[in-house]
Amino acid sequence: MYKGEKSVRGGIEDFLCPFTDMCITQGSNMKPSHMGIMANDVRGKQVGVRYNYFAPCTCKCIKTYPASGQSMWQSIAPVRFANGRIDYATFMICHDDTMNCQPGWKINQGDQIGTMGTKGNATGVHCHIEVSQSKDTSWIKNNYGNYHFNNEYDLDDCYFVDNTNIINGYGGNWRLTSSVPVGEVVDQILHVGSHVKLTGTYTVKEIDVKNNKAKINVAGEDVWLSSVPLEEIK
């Protein structure tokens, strides 16, 4: 992605690759330092250059580890991942020599979030990145001594690579936003005429706010369903 880039479809941000140029120097589950974790080490176009990279979604800082130039971020709302899942993104970025963020900071998709560096245990200028498709912020050491999230996914299942120049993608199944089409948006507040989705999409015919139910028509029959608290829209 490039600075300032945004991608929102159906009211949901697409989770974008934070790098303008991506050369993976160590992939997931690889020696020496990624055994058992879904991390990538990424440098830019030229070796040794401290390139900036950008927020893959609108997010807030959760934790920082200054000794290793490391910060944990979480999306403000659920995002769309490259594998089609919609959930919160929690991600860790490492080795930023210029890191100055603090827990609670919020930044918008496309704003600068970090700079490739060598802070901490690093053998060259790069960004170490891991992504969890959940709100779980647990940061756990595995049997190889490497830290990781619960619910980690390989990075080609996480971010879209629109406007990223892939120099070395380690054979990943990297996808564009066009590979994950967005269909009809389902109403979040039910009212008469709302569309709701079970195994298909149905129209709400009547609502009972007092008893927290909605009537839909399924295969020619009216069915009352319990629902989340309902709000009538005049």
State where each predicted segment sits.
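Short glycine/threonine/proline-enriched tight-turn/helix- or strand-capping micro-motif at secondary-structure
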Residues: T20-C57
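Conserved beta-strand/loop element in small beta-rich adapter and peptidoglycan-binding domains
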Residues: P56-T58, Q112, H195-D208
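SH3/SH3-like beta-barrel superfamily modules
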Residues: G200-S226
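Acidic, glycine-rich catalytic/binding loops that coordinate metals and/or anionic ligands
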Residues: M1-E13, G48, E130-G183
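Short hydrophobic beta/alpha edge segments that flank linear recognition/processing sites
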Residues: M72, N108-A122, I129
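Short coil-to-beta transition motif at edge beta-strands of beta-rich domains
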Residues: V186-L198
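A structural signal for short beta-strand/turn segments enriched in small hydrophobics and glycine
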Residues: I24, C59-C61, G104-M116
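Zn2+-dependent peptidoglycan hydrolase active-site motif and core
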Residues: R50, F54-N100, G124-Q133
